[in-house]
A protein has these predicted regions:
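Short aromatic-glycine-(Arg/Gly/Cys) micro-motifs in beta-strand/loop hairpins
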Residues: 1-20
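A short, exposed loop/beta-hairpin motif centered on an aromatic-Gly-Thr core
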Residues: 16-30
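A broad, low-specificity signal marking well-ordered, structured residues that form hydrophobic/aromatic
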Residues: 4, 24, 60
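Short, mixed-charge low-complexity intrinsically disordered segments
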Residues: 38-97
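Generic structural motif
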Residues: 11, 29, 65-68
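Short, conserved charged micro-motifs
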Residues: 31-36
Length: 97
């Protein structure tokens, strides 16, 4: 399953560029959630500006990429859209996680 993952931390909710995003091929939702967790943890660690327990601040959304769109095509478009625009163009509307 090809998915788009938008990972961030809860304090800023992805504002100020404090987020990560990627298009990945996963076997199931468990694997997608593992990617989301690692990506969100990477966001928090990269900014090194949170004193509280970061575990509670890790958040991510997972969307299924529309049929007929390749990983390469979707990945190439990431920098051209914000999350909402990318989802509208390349993803099914339902949030999987």
């Amino acid at each position: 399953m090809l998915v788009y993952i938008f990972a961030y931390e809860g304090s800023y909710g992805g504002l100020h560029g404090m987020y990560d995003e990627d298009v990945v091929e996963v076997r199931d939702m468990e694997e997608a959630n593992n990617y989301g967790y690692e990506m969100a943890a990477g966001v928090v660690e990269s900014y090194d500006c949170f004193d509280e327990d970061i575990e509670q601040e890790l958040e991510w959304r997972i969307y299924k990429i529309k049929e007929g769109i390749s990983a390469e095509e979707a990945r190439a478009a990431l920098g051209s859209y914000d999350e909402e625009g990318f989802v509208a163009e390349y993803c099914e509307k339902e949030v999987l996680s």
